[in-house]
Amino acid sequence: MAGSQRLKRMADSVQRELSELIRQELKDPRLGGLVTISAVKVSADMGYAEVYVTVMGRELGDEQSEAANKETLDVLNKASGFLRHELSRRIKTRITPRLRFHYDKTNAYGNYMFGLIEKAVQDLPEQSSEDKS
């Protein structure tokens, strides 16, 4: 149980510090919109951290957005060495995990589903007050 608490604390620290680092230190114009870290999962040996990111303002299924998301991941994965080095300066641990970035589609998928529900509700025929009784 203590090990899982330690991993959770490490994941929280990595998420907090990486958010700041990406916002303040990465000046690559290919990053585009607001990059947010939705989750971090640290391996049991703390050797790796799976970092899940989202980019605000991009829709699911849009080909341009998919290409931009891939480019964002490429930029983040190429900067992972720099980010890891900076992370090691901010988080004082014996091991700083290697970073692997993944695009988190849950937020975009939720927005997509919400749009489908809204469209379905709008397409419903108007019910008169007689039908409701």
Swiss-Prot record:
Question: In its UniProt record, which GO terms are filed under biological process?
Answer: maturation of SSU-rRNA
Name of the protein described by the UniProt record: Ribosome-binding factor A
Subunit info here reads: Monomer. Binds 30S ribosomal subunits, but not 50S ribosomal subunits or 70S ribosomes.
Which gene codes for it?
Answer: rbfA
> Recorded GO terms, molecular function?
ribosomal small subunit binding
| Source superkingdom | Bacteria
Localization (cell): Cytoplasm
Task: State if Cytoplasm is listed as a keyword.
Answer: yes
Organism encoding this protein: Acinetobacter baylyi (strain ATCC 33305 / BD413 / ADP1)
* Keywords, comma-separated and alphabetical: Cytoplasm, Ribosome biogenesis
Q: Name one GO cellular component term.
A: cytosol
